[in-house]
Regions:
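Small-residue (G/A/S/T)-rich helix-start motifs and N-terminal tracts that mark the onset
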Residues: 1-135, 144-161, 166-205
Length: 205
C-alpha cells in the first residue's frame, strides 16, 4: 500500500512535542551522520548543523580523518568520529565494523553526502542497507553508489528513506530528468511500490 502525504509549516509545528524542562540531549534522539571525503567537507558540516537545527539531541559525525582540522574548526556541538581515510580520500572499507557498531547505538543514520563513488563507499552503502537495523537515510553519493544495482534495496534490513533530486532519480531508474519531472508522483509511487522504501523526490513542487 503506497501512501502519499503533504506537509506545510503549520503541520510540522503541530508535530513538534513540547520539551520537558528537566530533559537533556539524550532525551531527544541520537543521530549518526556519515558524510564527507577529501574534497567534500562542507556537506558534512551542513548535514550536521541541519540535524542539530531540526532538534536531534546528540549528533555524532563520522568522517574521513583527513577532514579533521576543517571539521573541528566548523562544528562545536557534535561528537566526532574520525575514521581511516582510503587512498581515494574517502572512507576506507576497514571502517565497516566501527560504522555498523555506531549505527546500532543510534536512533537514525544519514549516509551519503559527499562520500564519493568508489569501491569502498559502494561496499559501505551495501553494508548499511543489508546489515544495519537502524532507520537509514540515503542521500547524494549513497544513491549514486547503488544506481548500478538498485535491487540491493530489496535486501534491506532496516527502514529506509531516500532523498534524491531529479538527476539522482534518473540514474536510479534509468530515465531522463524531463520524463521524471513530468510525472513526479507516478514515478515515485512506482519506485516505492517496487522497492518498499520511503522516497522524497526533492524539487520546488
Amino acid at each position: 500500500l503506497i501512501k502519499t502525504a503533504s506537509l506545510g509549516t503549520e503541520d510540522v509545528k503541530a508535530l513538534l512535542p513540547k520539551r520537558a524542562e528537566d530533559s537533556n540531549k539524550g532525551s531527544f534522539g541520537k543521530a549518526l551522520i556519515i558524510c564527507g571525503s577529501k574534497n567534500m567537507c562542507g556537506c558534512a558540516v551542513l548535514a550536521s548543523k541541519g540535524a542539530l537545527r531540526s532538534g536531534a539531541g546528540l549528533v555524532k559525525l563520522a568522517f574521513p580523518d583527513v577532514l579533521y582540522t576543517p571539521i573541528l574548526s566548523s562544528l562545536q556541538e557534535c561528537v566526532f568520529m574520525p575514521l581511516e581515510t582510503s587512498e581515494n580520500g574517502a572512507f576506507d572499507l576497514k571502517n565497516e565494523a566501527k560504522i555498523l557498531d555506531a549505527a546500532s547505538k543510534s536512533d537514525v543514520v544519514l549516509f551519503g553526502c559527499g562520500v564519493g563513488v568508489f569501491p569502498e563507499t559502494k561496499a559501505l552503502t551495501n553494508a548499511l542497507i543489508t546489515k544495519n537495523s537502524t532507520p537509514l537515510i540515503l542521500d547524494a553519493d549513497a544513491l549514486n553508489c547503488i544506481c548500478g544495482d538498485v535491487s540491493v534495496l530489496k535486501k534491506r534490513n532496516c527502514e529506509i528513506l531516500i532523498t534524491p533530486h531529479a538527476g539522482e532519480m534518473s540514474r536510479l531508474i534509468n530515465k531522463n530528468v524531463a520524463s521524471i519531472e513530468k510525472a513526479r508522483e507516478t514515478v515515485i509511487t512506482g519506485f516505492c511500490r517496487e522497492y518498499n522504501v520511503t522516497t522524497l523526490l526533492k524539487g520546488h513542487r
